């Protein structure tokens, strides 16, 4: 039969750059975290279709916020996954997410490809977990809980409450 094998190994890769800011509210009595605002600013080079790029960032932000606050795989002592269905694996709902402020107007063309584009597909999912966790730590510090310097993901209400009361 007909077979074809091809490889693409560019001499230089194309990496986007971005900055993410998250504002959260933390209930110190329960440890519940709610994301109030999220701003994502990225340089994806020349943007061919802004609507698709914005959608990619929105989806990535939802994934990252879910990873930071909710998603957790648990296993038994034999390595069998215990959180393998939507009944016991938490993901964010639309009501858990804020309206995002997304900006990709800074378009520094990439010099390593003819279109001047950079990847945008996973940017939101990469920058958002640390932005959320750092916002939680900052909110706790602002509330007088300066002893809290780290909380493992997911930053669940029980983990936040335990950190506050440690």
Language-model features: where?
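C-terminal catalytic domains of large/alpha subunits in multi-subunit enzymes
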Residues: 1-166
